[in-house]
Swiss-Prot record:
Residues 632-666 form a coiled coil. It comes from the Viruses. Inhibitors targeting HIV-1 viral envelope proteins are used as antiretroviral drugs. Attachment of virions to the cell surface via non-specific interactions and CD4 binding can be blocked by inhibitors that include cyanovirin-N, cyclotriazadisulfonamide analogs, PRO 2000, TNX 355 and PRO 542. In addition, BMS 806 can block CD4-induced conformational changes. Env interactions with the coreceptor molecules can be targeted by CCR5 antagonists including SCH-D, maraviroc (UK 427857) and aplaviroc (GW 873140), and the CXCR4 antagonist AMD 070. GO terms for cellular component: host cell endosome membrane; host cell plasma membrane; membrane; viral envelope; virion membrane. The record marks R509, A510 as: Cleavage. Belongs to the HIV-1 env protein family. It comes from Human immunodeficiency virus type 1 group M subtype B (isolate OYI) (HIV-1). InterPro entries: Gp120_core_sf (IPR036377), Gp160 (IPR037527), GP41-like (IPR000328), HIV1_Gp120 (IPR000777). This is Envelope glycoprotein gp160.
């Protein structure tokens, strides 16, 4: 009965307790999320940075690129790392690639650097008296072979023998000199057949290339400084723009040969499967088309003339190198390539173009005109600049049923040689390439083409005409750099978690850790944010990978140039790369220090996560998203989150400072430190001054009050007798009355005595009041403890009651279940028994039925 009464009395309390428990469960389900900082996450963003070069060049090589690479490029990595990024899709755009612009500037700087110490040919800007060199010879082919060997005979007037006056080693004396010039290098004066001048003489400063320099390029690798990476697209059919699903990361590109050529791309990389055509816009005929072959076409070029070189003095300390004479027959330079291989290549290109341009007939034609560098295939062969006529290569029509056929096995391209070259099509810059002695032979591989498409009326006839193009060397570099892009690594990431920074403590500065290669940590880019395979420790260590090794390599390259007392463009870039790598690391460490996360890979904060930044749940974030996807999700709020973390850390440091200021009172012995004595004296003076001031104020108030009542002021220590009541008469003269028992405070004289008396009264008053307060608090605590004990006993009894009720309910439920199961079992057994008996009685029932039928 007592338990039932208790349940009846506290039924309302039970209802409120249930509601409170439900609210707690709801609140726990909607748990707050907090911003957490992660250091070492595999996240990157597109960037432009200073690239430096790596090369296998040797110091004893005299070739211009080799010398340049030896002094300014770092050695290539013997074991380059390429990390495949699984489950990563990245957008590439070869037409908006800053690496191309950098390479263009670098190659131009290379040529300028190589020509700086060379001789200027300004004294040769004089009138030249020229006559045509006789190019006929008795040793030419006979008449039966004139058709096939017509290219061997140099055209009349192609080579000219010129005389001119030049300054000798003595400035005021002139001397007549003779030299051989090619027709492309001189211009007639006033349409005169005998008076000429050097080309570009009136518009450019002509610089003679140094005699020991050749122009054969060697492979160069473009590398990024630490903190950056190069993403590489490995899709075999990648067209240069759009998403790429097979992505890897490297520190340096493959070896790229800086071959300066037009129309045909030489000694480049090949497509892996089939021919690929690339253009920024195929519908715009002004845009160039870059063709990448899947199989190279070998082209062999020759200058058969056996030239001799002559040195002509054009002033003190300056010499002009020219062709003195040609020994033997004067024959034309030429290039040979296989017709079958070339036609097969053109067929593959035409097939690709036909698919791109709606099955129209594809026609190839010669260049439409322009500078010699564009009209002809220009390139450098053994130090001489060849200009070859490619009309035989681009003179065919292709459709589904017909193709060009020819019985000739070899295609021979007639070539002209030019010594004065207008480099990079820039006004004011021209170079004179000294003649090379002896015969010249070179072999190259055609790996690509540069084409343009005609616009206008021809397209309406179902024919698309394509012509060779070139001239902009950016397209040459773009054909090799199409699959690369530079990104900067963003190792700092923020994400919501349930953890909140609880303890205010001072963080210690951590020394930076070194790793092997910083590219390794990007291998986890395709993993989810919560994947166990992604260890932040390894990734954070690898963030500095390459910095130390890279700095050492760059320093060696820079030190190699110190004896020259000058830095090439690469030396400057390497210095920039060194500074940039350190700045990137220090910037991240500075942010971690500002946020109070120095030396931590995972750092909790007190900044609550705002659902407006991202309303995804923790499971959606950590189990389904990569760090790259998450970074794109919150990219617009990253700066705001960083600001909030900084403000939170500033507030925490203020709280920490206030907390540390209380540490000096932690030890009792510090109270007696001599450094605190002046503070104690100051406090004592303030207290005494306050007491004296209060005493004076109260005294003045007392005087004012008494003056208002009509009394004159008395001494400050005079105590007036206490007024007796009406039932207490005064004493009489005969001493018959009560002895005077009026109370009065003791009288003191002097200022110090007055202060001491007031201070004693204040201390006694404080003691009594403090004692009363302690007694009151003790009484309250006693009452609360007693009441709390009673409440605990009540809850314990209530818990025991409900436990017993729950136990009884469970027992009743089990009993009811057992009874129901037992009854069900009995029913089943009874049904089975009846069925069994019915089965056994079947013969009896049959017999009884037969008996009734017979009766």
């Amino acid at each position: 009965m007592t338990a039932r009464g208790t349940r009846k009395n506290y039924q309302r309390l039970w209802r409120w307790g249930t509601m409170l428990l439900g609210m707690l469960m709801i609140c726990s389900a909607a748990e707050n999320l907090w911003v957490t900082v992660y250091y070492g996450v595999p996240v990157w963003k597109e960037a432009t940075t200073t690239l430096f070069c790596a090369s296998d060049a040797r110091a004893y090589a005299t070739e211009v690129h080799n010398v340049w690479a030896t002094h300014a490029c770092v050695p290539t990595d013997p074991n380059p790392q390429e990390v495949v990024l699984g489950n990563v899709t990245e957008n590439f755009d070869m037409w908006k690639n800053n690496m191309v612009e950098q390479m263009q500037e670098d190659i131009i700087s290379l040529w300028d650097q190589s020509l700086k110490p060379c001789v200027k040919l300004t004294p040769l800007c004089v009138t030249l008296d020229c006559t045509d060199v006789n190019t006929t010879s008795s040793s030419l082919r006979n008449a039966t072979n004139t058709t096939s060997s017509s290219w061997e005979t140099m055209e009349k007037g192609e080579l000219k023998n010129c005389s001119f006056n030049t300054t000798t080693s003595i400035r005021d004396k002139m001397q007549e000199q003779y030299a051989l010039f090619y027709k492309l290098d001189v211009l007639p004066i006033d349409k005169n057949d005998t008076k000429f001048r050097l080309i570009h003489c009136n518009t450019s400063t002509i610089t003679q290339a140094c005699p020991k320099i050749s122009f054969e390029p060697i492979p160069m690798h473009y590398c990024t400084p630490a903190g950056f990476a190069i993403l590489k697209c490995n899709d075999k059919k990648f067209n240069g723009t759009g998403p790429c699903t097979n992505v890897s990361t490297v520190q340096c590109t493959h070896g790229i040969k800086p071959v300066v050529s037009t129309q045909l791309l030489l000694n480049g990389s090949l497509a892996e499967e089939e021919v690929i055509i690339r253009s920024s816009n195929f519908t715009n005929n002004a845009k160039i088309i870059i063709v990448q072959l899947n199989k190279s076409v070998e082209i062999n070029c020759t200058r058969p003339n056996n030239n001799t070189r002559n040195r002509i003095s054009i002033g003190p300390g300056r010499a002009f190198h020219t062709t003195k004479q040609i020994i033997g027959d004067i024959r034309q330079a030429h290039c040979n390539l296989s017709r079958a291989t070339w036609e097969k290549t053109l067929e593959q290109i035409a097939t690709k173009l036909r698919k791109q341009f709606r099955n129209k007939t594809i026609a190839f034609d010669r260049s439409s005109g322009g500078d010699p560098e564009i009209v002809m295939h220009s390139f450098n062969c053994g130090g001489e600049f060849f200009y070859c006529n490619t009309s035989q290569l681009f003179n065919s029509t292709w459709n589904d049923t017909t193709r060009a056929n020819s019985t000739e096995v070899t295609i021979t391209l007639p070539c002209r040689i030019k010594q004065i070259v207008n480099m990079w099509q820039e006004v004011g810059k021209a170079m004179y390439a000294p003649p090379i002695s002896g015969q010249i032979r070179c072999s190259s591989k055609i790996t690509g083409l540069l084409l343009t498409r005609d616009g206008g009326k021809n397209t309406t006839n179902g024919i698309e005409i394509f012509r060779p193009a070139g001239g902009d060397m950016r397209d040459n570099w773009r054909s090799e750099l199409y699959k690369y892009k530079v990104v900067k690594i963003e190792p700092l990431g923020v994400a919501p978690t349930k953890a909140r920074r609880r303890v205010v403590q001072r963080e210690k500065r951590a020394v930076g850790m070194l790793g092997a290669m910083f590219l390794g940590f990007l291998g986890a880019a395709g993993s989810t944010m919560g994947a166990r395979s992604m260890t932040l420790t390894v990734q954070a260590r690898q963030l500095l990978s390459g910095i130390v090794q890279q700095q050492n390599n760059l320093l060696r390259a820079i030190e190699a140039q110190q004896h020259l007392l000058q830095l090439t463009v690469w030396g400057i870039k390497q210095l920039q790369a060194r500074v940039l790598a350190v700045e990137r690391y220090l910037k991240d460490q500075q942010l971690l220090g500002i946020w109070g996360c120095s030396g931590k890979l995972i750092c909790t904060t007190t900044v609550p996560w705002n659902a407006s930044w991202s309303n995804k749940s923790l499971n959606e974030i950590w189990d389904n998203m990569t760090w790259m996807q998450w970074e794109r999700e919150i990219d617009n709020y990253t700066h705001l989150i960083y600001t909030l973390i900084e403000e939170s850390q500033n507030q925490q440091e203020k709280n920490e400072q206030e907390l540390l200021e209380l540490d000096k009172w932690a030890g009792l012995w510090s109270w007696f430190s001599i450094t605190n004595w002046l503070w104690y004296i100051r406090i004592f003076i303030i207290i005494v001054g306050g007491l004296v001031g209060l005493r004076i104020v109260f005294a003045v108030l007392s005087i004012v009050n008494r003056v208002r009542q009509g009394y004159s002021p008395l001494s400050f220590q005079t105590r007036l007798p206490t007024q007796r009541g009406p039932d207490r008469p005064e004493g009489i003269e005969e001493e018959g009355g009560e002895r005077d028992r009026d109370r009065s405070g003791r009288l003191v004289d002097g200022f110090l005595a007055l202060i001491w008396d007031d201070l004693r009264s204040l201390c006694l008053f404080s003691y009594h009041r403090l004692r009363d307060l302690i007694l009151i608090v003790a009484r309250i605590v006693e009452l609360l403890g007693r009441r709390g004990w009673e409440v605990l006993k009540y809850w314990w009894n209530l818990l025991q009651y409900w436990s017993q009720e729950l136990k009884n309910s469970v027992i009743s439920l089990l009993n009811a279940t057992a009874i129901a199961v037992a009854e069900g079992t009995d029913r089943v057994i009874e049904i089975v028994q009846r069925a069994y008996r019915a089965f056994l009685n079947i013969p009896r029932r049959i017999r009884q039925g037969l008996e009734r039928a017979l009766l």
